A protein has these predicted regions:
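Rieske [2Fe-2S] iron-sulfur-binding domain
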Residues: 25-115
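A boundary/linker detector
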Residues: 1-12, 16, 20, 115
Length: 115
């Protein structure tokens, strides 16, 4: 899926039906790959950079989601580092984090805010 980049706006990147509950889906926004995670119990969508900072591979959307230290997280499928879904912070290395974007659901669409 590819969406056009619009500065300072909310951009429609996919439909809610395209997301898999408690799992990841990758989308492209301009030249940027973003991993989306949908938490149906709370109705939240999380948008993180899809590039694993330890391997430079675009694989975060394929990671396993769960709970570590009371935080919802995704584990990189390559080297297994855990990243907080809310902040993108690596739980094993405070110096490393994934980019994050504000995300929301609106009328069955998934929107990401561009800075």
């Amino acid at each position: 899926m590819t969406a056009q980049l619009k500065k300072d706006t909310w951009t429609d990147v996919c439909q809610l039906d395209d997301l898999v509950p408690e799992s990841g889906v990758a989308v492209r926004l301009g030249k940027t790959q973003i991993a989306l995670f949908y938490w149906p119990k709370t109705g939240e969508v999380f948008a993180l950079g899809n590039t694993d900072p330890f391997s430079s591979a675009n694989v975060i959307a394929r990671g396993i989601v769960g709970d570590v230290q009371g935080k919802r997280m995704v584990a990189s499928p390559l080297y297994k580092q855990h990243f907080c879904l809310e902040t993108g912070q690596c739980l094993e290395d405070d110096a490393v984090s994934l980019m994050t974007w504000p995300a929301r659901l609106e009328e069955g669409q998934v929107l990401i805010q561009q800075p």
